[in-house]
């Protein structure tokens, strides 16, 4: 299991996450143990599709690893200031998702 987290900038994942995914190509020929992939995102924007492009970008990476699947995503919108995520409904969604991972 791998859980990636990224802020959404201009409706896309951060450059740091994109670089990590691009540099992970050494995993491709290996007998990797991860199967389920999760994506946690946050943004100032609060539209339901704000993280859509980041999800599609990650799905492109996942498609290269036939044993993997996107197991879940969590989006926290309207998160601008430090601490703004406190009490956000996405936290409970993330907790429940994490608790379901065995």
What spans do the regions from the language model cover?
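Glycine-rich phosphate/pyrophosphate-binding loop and the adjoining helix
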Residues: 59-102
């Amino acid at each position: 299991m791998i859980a990636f987290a990224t802020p959404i900038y201009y409706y896309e994942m951060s450059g740091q996450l994109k670089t990590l995914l691009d540099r992970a190509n050494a995993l491709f020929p290996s007998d990797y143990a991860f199967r389920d992939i999760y994506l946690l995102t946050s943004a100032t924007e609060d539209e339901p599709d704000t993280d859509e492009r980041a999800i599609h970008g990650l799905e492109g990476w996942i498609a290269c690893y036939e044993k993997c699947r996107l197991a879940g995503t969590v989006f926290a919108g309207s998160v601008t200031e430090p601490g703004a995520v406190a009490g956000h409904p996405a936290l409970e969604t993330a907790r429940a998702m994490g608790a379901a991972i065995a």
